[in-house]
């Protein structure tokens, strides 16, 4: 985990130095590891992809409680939420997270799931009731483009 933390720090610093600031009216997205998932490199890469594609992206790690995730998504009027799932034991909290987000007064327009577990078992997206299960951050960015403009 030490090396992962160093990689994540390097990605964040480089991104901070090189990435353009999003426009004031940019659509909001939230990318996070589900509660209990400490693997943040994939979600961090998606955060960078979406930001450079014109989104205002809130990045949350797996230490963020579900209640805080829901509150922040609501406060920011988030259009898109991306959840990263690493292992089978995170499946129940992922299902709960999606259900809780969908029950919000203003739910996000789309909820994507990704990460190692979803990549190895894409059929889980239906069980989780996600809108999409992109296999890579690039694919997630491309799918997210349909939610960038308001209807």
Q: Over which residues does each language-model region extend?
A:
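Long amphipathic alpha-helical segments
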Residues: 1-22
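General structural feature for long, well-ordered alpha-helical segments within catalytic domains
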Residues: 3-6, 10, 42, 46, ...
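Generic secondary-structure signature for well-ordered alpha-helical cores
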Residues: 9-16, 103, 145, 149
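Hydrophobic/basic alpha-helical segments enriched in Actinobacteria
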Residues: 19, 25-31, 70, 104, ...
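Glycine-rich phosphate/diphosphate-binding loops that line cofactor/substrate pockets in enzymes
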Residues: 20-23, 75-77
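Glycine-rich active-site/cofactor-binding loop and its immediate structural neighborhood
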Residues: 26-60
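Cofactor-cradling patches in redox/metallo enzymes
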Residues: 49-52, 59, 64-126
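Peripheral docking tails and interdomain loops at the edges
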Residues: 116-151
């Amino acid at each position: 985990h030490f090396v992962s933390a160093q990689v994540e720090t390097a990605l964040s610093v480089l991104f901070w130095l090189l990435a353009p600031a999003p426009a004031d009216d940019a659509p909001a997205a939230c990318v996070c590891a589900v509660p209990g998932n400490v693997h943040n490199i994939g979600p961090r890469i998606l955060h960078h992809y979406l930001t450079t594609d014109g989104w205002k992206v809130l990045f949350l790690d797996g230490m963020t409680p579900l209640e805080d995730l829901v509150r922040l998504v609501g406060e920011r009027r988030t259009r898109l939420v991306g959840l990263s799932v690493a292992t089978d034991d995170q499946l129940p909290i992922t299902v709960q997270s999606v259900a809780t987000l969908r029950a919000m007064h203003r739910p996000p327009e789309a909820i994507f799931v990704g990460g190692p577990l979803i990549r190895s078992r894409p059929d889980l997206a239906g069980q989780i009731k996600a809108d999409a299960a992109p296999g890579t951050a690039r694919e997630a960015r491309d799918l997210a483009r349909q939610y960038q403009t308001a209807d």
